[in-house]
Structures are given as structure tokens and as C-alpha cells.
Amino acid sequence: MGRNMALVTIAFLAGLSIGLTVRSTVAAAPEQQDMHAANLAAIEKLHKADEECTLTQDPKCLTTLWSDDGINLGFPGPPVVGIKDMGEAYAKFRAQYPEFQVLKYAPDYKTMQSAIVDEWAIEVGYTDATFKMSANAAPVSPPRTKDMRLLKRQSDGSWKFALVGLK
């Protein structure tokens, strides 16, 4: 009888353990789905801000899109690193080309490949753009640009660019 009782106790504890594990996994799934939905909404907010800031070319607005330690590989020359240098680079570009105007900025989010892991997200896709260097210049539409963007979730739940590279 003692041996049977030990087996029943072990079976009961194993069943209880499995049940609690399954229950906690099932209970965590909605939390993970909620977090994923919140991340997607916050990333979409960054996308909209990116489009607005790029079209206006406001240096302060463009700077707000970046994490404090962001790296921009899109400027001519060496990479621009850090929020302070990012702001200076945008202001310098605006001063050098005061009539520069973005006529079209259209990242293709429908075909963009993306993944979110913890506080990081990566996006790889294409962007179409048209711009004018001055008011009298003809519009320039470079070929579709392939870019890679690394996003970093901020402590407030928002997302900012951590690294942007163009190919």
C-alpha cells in the first residue's frame, strides 16, 4: 500500500505541475499578444512621424526619431553617431541646402520584412522618394532604395531608430 501511495502522490504532483505549466503558458499568451499589438502600434506611430518629419525636413523633428545612441549611415561621409551629432548633422544639411524639399517619401511597409525580439525590431524593405535640391531644380527620383532599420524600444514603450543603413 505504501508503494502505491507513493506512485499516486508522484503522479498527482506530476499532473499538477503539468497543469500549472500549461495554465501559465496559456495565460501568458494573451499578455504576449497584447504586448505585440502595443509594439506594432508604437512602431506604426514611429513610421508616421518618420514620414512627416522627412517631408518637412525639420531638423528638430528628424532628430526626435532617434534613440540617444542612434547611428545614421545615410549621410555622406562617416556614420553620424548619437543624438547630439544627429541634430547637428540635420541642422548643417538644412543650412547648406535651405531650399531642399522632399516631394515624396514612401517606405513600402506592405512588403517590408520585420521582426521584433525583446526591445529590438529590425525592418528591411524598400523606399521610393522624390526630392528637389533647390526651388528651381528639377525633381530627382532615385531608383528604389533598399534600406535596413534597427529600432529600439524606449522605456516609455515608444520606438526610435537605433541604426539606419541604405544600400
Residue ranges and their predicted role:
Residues 122-128, 148:
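Beta-strand secondary-structure signal
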Residues 130-134:
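Sequence/structural signature of outer-membrane beta-barrel proteins
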